[in-house]
Amino acid sequence: MKRTMLYLSLLAVSCSVSAAKYPVLTESSPEKAGFNVERLNQMDRWISQQVDAGYPGVNLLIIKDNQIVYRKAWGAAKKYDGSVLMAQPVKATTGTLYDLASNTKMYATNFALQKLMSEGKLHPDDLIAKYISGFADSPNDTIKGKNTLRISDLLHHSGGFPADPQYPNKAVAGALYSQDKGQTLEMIKRTPLEYQPGSKHIYSDVDYMLLGFIVESVTGQPLDRYVEESIYRPLGLTHTVFNPLLKGFKPQQIAATELNGNTRDGVIHFPNIRTSTHWGQVHDEKAFYSMGGVSGHAGLFSNTGDIAVLMQTMLNGGGYGDVQLFSAETVKMFTTSSKEDATFGLGWRVNGNATMTPTFGTLASPQTYGHTGWTGTVTVIDPVNHMAIVMLSNKPHSPVADPQKNPNMFESGQLPIATYGWVVDQVYAALKQK
């Protein structure tokens, strides 16, 4: 009931408020923003050491009080060709595009849902079956409940779906195998629930694959076209896209990821698997093979400058400059912690307890929210300190440490920088020791 009343409130506000003038980002210096420059220099040196130790490339940008106060790039956008180190790596720049991985969930799907809900075209309590035809339990399903699933259940990751059904891998997916977008939706409908909906929170890509399909159902447009035309273009963002190689970008503008396709250095095999270095194509297997590069859970590419505008839009309460995407009430609803688990908002992860330290560090306010991405991306938005941090990297662009023991652990993932919270803490420490 409270959620419904909040929704009605935000809808009333969004209908009565015309495009307002919101703060836009300007450039400033760390000193003027109150940062201890020596502490930031120490962080700079440490990141350089991590790159020297094998971490491929990093971009970091800091916003404080509507100003970009720090922006820097380290390392390489591409330094391997297959398993061979390049004689002349492609350097990372502050304009390099990165595969956002699961940050796609926030800066594509959540932004779309927040906009559509502000416009009254969606409701958090709407049933999934309202938008996805044929979404229902199968007679042989052990756990029932698909007919009761709401949009908010998917946003809270409490819908009952498994974390990763691996649809494109026939040996793992079995009868749920799909490497075709239309067929993938049918396979998602057939995917059995693993727990009773609403009984707990289990982070699942399937939730956001479904949410992406819902955005397409409501708008009548492919997800990428809708967000690029209705969200990014009005904000003046030209470097935030799905399938960048199909939209005018060159590989040299993009950070490469896994060295030998999706094979984890030769130990993973399935039909049509890529075997050459990912450079401009989404790394995520479900997004690439099962969804054609455009999915609600992964597939978006961007750079720190564009992400900064999107984070500032959240700090502003839903708008940027003369553009209003959604209302402040919508932002509040989406970033409020779930009663069952303080670390889950509606899609956004919230700094609700110490389990989020690897993401938000130890110094961010409890109201801080953001997300991470498997490729080495993290976004941190702190409305209390009116600050935001984005770190983009290409963590999988390194050899797998031990393919037989753990094919998902890359050598770069064993370095301290792979725990984003350390970098976040250094930013906060520099602010507190001004």
Curated annotation (Swiss-Prot):
Transmembrane domains' residue ranges: 7-25
Single GO biological process annotation from the record: proteolysis
EC class of the enzyme, as a word: hydrolase
Alphabetical UniProt keywords: Carboxypeptidase, Cell inner membrane, Cell membrane, Hydrolase, Membrane, Protease, Transmembrane, Transmembrane helix
Annotated catalysed reactions: Preferential cleavage: (Ac)2-L-Lys-D-Ala-|-D-Ala. Also transpeptidation of peptidyl-alanyl moieties that are N-acyl substituents of D-alanine
EC numbers on record: 3.4.16.4
GO terms for MF: serine-type D-Ala-D-Ala carboxypeptidase activity
PROSITE patterns linked: PROKAR_LIPOPROTEIN
Family: Belongs to the peptidase S12 family. YfeW subfamily.
HAMAP family: S12_YfeW (MF_01034)
Protein name according to UniProt: Putative D-alanyl-D-alanine carboxypeptidase
UniProt source species: Escherichia coli O157:H7
